Amino acid sequence: MSAPSARPSWYALETGSWRDYVTLLHPPYTAWHLSYVVIGGCLAPAVAWGRLGAAVAAFALAVGVGAHALDELSGRPLRTSIPAPVLVGLAVVSIAGACAIGVVGAIAFEPWLLVLVPVGLFLVLAYNLELLGGRFHSDLWFGLAWGGFPVICGYAAVAGDLGVAAFLGAAFGVLLSLSQRVLSNDVRHVRRRVVGVTGELELEDGERETLDADRLIAGEERSLRLLAATVVVLAAAMVAFRL
């Protein structure tokens, strides 16, 4: 019988000290979802880089720090030793900062964008705190909140309105995030809940191969790594194209 890796995720560092804070940020996934904001902004007719940068900063605070701090408060899925009061403080300050960026940006540029601030706040709290019995903590809401919404916000922050390209880009974000969720669900299950794996594969030539925990999730984790890199490279290519 083989045991899964002691790490709760493929990007988690060894526990302790500053490494816990790096792991808390989910670096590849944060970069993945910030790329959606960039993609949305680059789909706009003309790119205002300052406003796009502000949108990326807001999502870096809300998703990269705030959402992940709230998630870690619930059951310690990353097994960090960060004190609960510190996680609460990180969540409150980062989410408040993201909201402040949104409010100031909307007042300075396009007042209707204020609507997106409470929507984003609701999505962060409802998903990560599993409000209403976890109704919003589902694959679909993950796709909408972490895939579609960032694209919409990136486009709106730059263009000041919403066009067909924004909604098509949002659909791309939703579908790709759903694919991410399908892959990561199995990986998280094995890494965080399974304590042992026993089995073997019998090939048509009679040869037998041992089935262990690492083999169970190797394909999914390789796909997640490649998808994370793909989205970041796509966002970078779109920035280079629009410069």
Model segments located where?
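Hydrophobic alpha-helical transmembrane segments
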Residues: 1-126, 144-243
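Membrane-helix interface "capping/anchor" motifs
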Residues: 129-141
